[in-house]
Amino acid sequence: MVKILKRWFATGLLIALSCPAAAQPAPTVDATLASRPETVVWGYITADLPPALTIKSGQTVKIDTVSHQGLLGKEDPAAFFASAGIAKDQVLQDAIDIYKTVPRTKGLSVHVLTGPIYVEGAAPGDMLEVRIHNLELRVPYGVNNSGPTSGVLPGLLSEPAPKIIKLDTKRNVALFSDDIEVPLAPFLGIMSVAPSRDVLLVSSRPPWRWGGNIDFNKLVAGASLYLPVFNTGAQFYTGDPHAVQADGEVNGTAIEASLTATLQFIVHKGAGKAMNWPRAEDATHYYTMGMDLDLNVAMRQATRETVNFLREEFGLSTEDAYALASIAVDFRVAEAVDSVQMIYGMIPKKLFKQTPQFWSKR
């Protein structure tokens, strides 16, 4: 094992392992981005829009996001949520405004995305690190929605089955029923840079190399997501906010609930050139990803990413990396419902006597 490891996705700087492990203090919020009709798109991700906000690398932004649930029918959000006893003053005004004024493009997807955020200095071949400092629910309720064509069992239900679920944010649980409570673990289902120029515009439904709808429930506060950059400025979008979701997201949705995210954006020059897929990290694990229409192919990709990571970052031989992946790395299904499916690998940091310092202890 090397004595000093490169910071994950090397930036040309080495970080000594003797540095104290204390987490960095919460950064100052440099800008805010509200989810208004002029700062959101509905159902797609594109490299062909002017920035909703321009920032410098290292800056932190407080971003409002809006769930699409309650915005997809003929009735407006206030009427939709009133059916479950949600008072009108608890329905977000920006959700009502978006429903009334933002057009949906036929054939694309359902997600309302805030952005794009243009990060100065980001260029193709770089890597954008998104540090998730805080995720705060904006409403005390969420929606799980399924139906006859939804999820991994599309023939199971004969009728749409929307379920509006109250959230107890003081106790940090979702009140699924009188005798079932689910611990909350908010995260953003979609975090994405703009796709490559040869693609230009994509539906927000399938995840891919630029991130997108990865529905990865490990991306809670205290985690980092690493995305390859394909365009000048990176052009970051986010949305599809979740209060909690299990691996697989098997009926097609989580508890979908609007939230405010505090995110820090850091450009790592040249570090995206060799990236095949996004990666992630938290205080306890490194995460690799594989995506494909075929879950078996996604599994092979996630395994290959894991082997490559262990070789590149820890100096293992191919044989040892493959062996370690088999005996110590768990592979799980992040989501199996977005046409393109995603497998992730969990590499425990505790396997290694020495690992680089991470910014968060959570």
Label every PLM stretch briefly:
Residues H68-F80, L135-N145, G233-A243, A334-V337:
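Short, Lys/Arg- and Gly-enriched loop/turn segments at beta-strand edges
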Residues M1-A10:
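Bacterial N-terminal signal peptides that target proteins for export
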Residues L184-L295, V307:
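Conserved mixed alpha/beta catalytic, RNA-binding, or beta-rich assembly cores of soluble enzyme
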Residues I98-T101, K106-Y118, E129-L219:
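Intrinsically disordered, low-complexity linker/loop segments enriched in Gly/Pro
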Residues Q69, G73-E120:
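Extended, compositionally biased flexible segments
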Residues P27-D30, A34-V40, D48-K62, S67-H68, ...:
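Alpha/propeptide regions of enzymes that mature by internal proteolysis
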Residues L14-A22:
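Hydrophobic h-region of N-terminal signal peptides that target proteins for export
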Residues S339-R362:
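Long, compositionally biased
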